[in-house]
Amino acid sequence: MDIAHDLQSIGAQEQALVFPHFDPARAWALGNRMHALATSRGHAIAIDIVTFGQPLFYAALAGATPDNADWVRRKRNVVAHFRRSSYAIGLRMQQAGATLADKHGLPVAEYASHGGSFPLTVAGAGVIGSITASGLPQRADHEFVVEALCAELGHDYAVLALARS
C-alpha cells in the first residue's frame, strides 16, 4: 500500500461522492442499500448514517457486536472533527508517526482514526454528517462505504476504488 497514493485517491473520492441533496428518505435508501450489500457478502458489520447531531440509519448485521457500535461512534467522531474520512486521517497520522492523542490531544476512547467513516457531503452545504461501517479490516470498511456511495450516486466504483494492495 502506497500511503501517498491512497491519500490522493481518498481526496478524489471525497470530492466526487457529493449528494445534490440529502434527507432522511435518502439516508434510509442508502442504509438499506448498504445492508443488502453487506448481507449478500456475509459481512458481520454495523452501519451508521448520521447528520451531525441526528441519527438517520443504524443496523447491526448478524455477527456484529457492541464493540462495532463503539468503533462506529469513534470513527464518526473523527469525521465530525476533521470533515475528512477517518481512513484519510489515519493514514496522515501513520505518515507523521503520530496518533490523534499526540498530535491533536484527542482521546483514544472517543476518536478512532481507522478506516470506515466517510464524510456525508452535500453540494452547496459541505460536510453535514457521516456514513460509517465497522466490522471489516479498516481499508475494507472504507471501501465498503465508498462502493455503496458510488452505487447510490451513480459513479463507477472501479474508477474511484483504492488500488489493490
From Swiss-Prot:
Tree of life domain: Bacteria
SUPFAM superfamilies in alphabetical order: GlcG-like
UniProt xrefs under Pfam families: HbpS-like
PANTHER family hit by this protein: PTHR28255, UPF0303 PROTEIN YBR137W
Protein family according to the UniProt entry: Belongs to the UPF0303 family.
Protein name according to UniProt: UPF0303 protein Bcen2424_1558
Native source species: Burkholderia cenocepacia (strain HI2424)
Lineage of origin: Bacteria, Pseudomonadati, Pseudomonadota, Betaproteobacteria, Burkholderiales
